[in-house]
Regions:
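Extracytoplasmic/periplasmic substrate-recognition and gating elements
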Residues: 122-192
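Short helices/loops that flank or line small-molecule/ion binding pockets
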Residues: 8-10, 95-111
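Beta->alpha turn/N-cap motifs
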Residues: 36, 113-118
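Non-transmembrane alpha-helical segments in soluble domains
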Residues: 8-15, 74-78, 100, 166-174
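Soluble non-cytosolic domains of exported or imported proteins
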Residues: 2-5, 64-71, 97, 159-164
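Glycine-centered hinge/linker elements that transmit conformational signals in sensory
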Residues: 8-13, 42-92
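Acidic, glycine-anchored loop motifs typical of Ca2+
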Residues: 18-28
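Periplasmic solute-binding protein
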Residues: 1, 33-58, 148-157
């Protein structure tokens, strides 16, 4: 089963001090490579946890404080990625593939990336594939992945007189995009342009 346990097994088995200098740095082999600050959200999302849920009245409430499941995932991340040194600790954000090309150089077994970056992998010497994040346990109902859409909101002017019409138009455009644009994106970009 593709679970956190199996993921841990793989990423902790491969980290090696390649240059023999006694410390893990950019010259060594790692199990996992990622953007700074993304580990924890990616893993708690993969475990099916939500930071915001609805209360009994249908209002959104913050779900993290006092939630033992989030603490369990945090402890797992801390142990596996940091204490077992399965993760290359770097300071770059979304440009980490340019600043620290560990994955492209074959120095990382796994790397998280948005599909935007998959095109940068075409020139890699090693073959690569695209997989989902693991389930927390085999009993989890399905796989979950954090989707980063690039825009959190759309601004509508305060002076707008037709808010309902604008909302309906935005919803229709989103629906059409999901139905028409995304399948073409998968076919043209992911299967042809970005992959090999």
């Amino acid at each position: 089963d593709w679970t956190f346990d199996r993921f841990e097994e793989l990423i902790t088995a491969v980290h090696v001090d390649l240059d023999g200098n006694g410390k893990f740095d950019k010259n060594d082999l790692y199990g996992y490579h990622d953007r700074k600050g993304f580990l924890y959200p990616l893993m708690y999302t993969a475990a099916g946890l939500k930071t915001v849920i609805e209360d009994e009245a249908g209002r959104p409430v913050f779900n993290m404080p006092g939630n033992e499941a989030f603490q369990t995932i945090y402890d797992w991340c801390d142990r596996v990625f940091y204490k077992e040194e399965a993760y290359y600790k770097q300071d770059a954000g979304n440009d980490f593939f340019v600043k620290h090309p560990m994955f492209q150089e074959g120095k990382a077994l796994f790397s998280d990336m948005t599909f935007f970056y998959v095109g940068m992998m075409r020139d890699m010497l090693s073959d690569f594939g695209i997989i989902v994040f693991p389930k927390y346990t085999a009993e989890q109902d399905r796989y979950y992945s954090w989707v980063e859409g690039g825009a959190g909101c759309i601004g509508v002017a305060v002076t707008c007189q037709e808010k309902e019409a604008v909302g309906a138009a935005l919803e229709a455009l989103s629906c059409a995009s999901m139905r028409d644009v995304i399948p073409i994106y998968y076919e043209n970009n992911l299967k042809a342009k970005y992959s090999r």
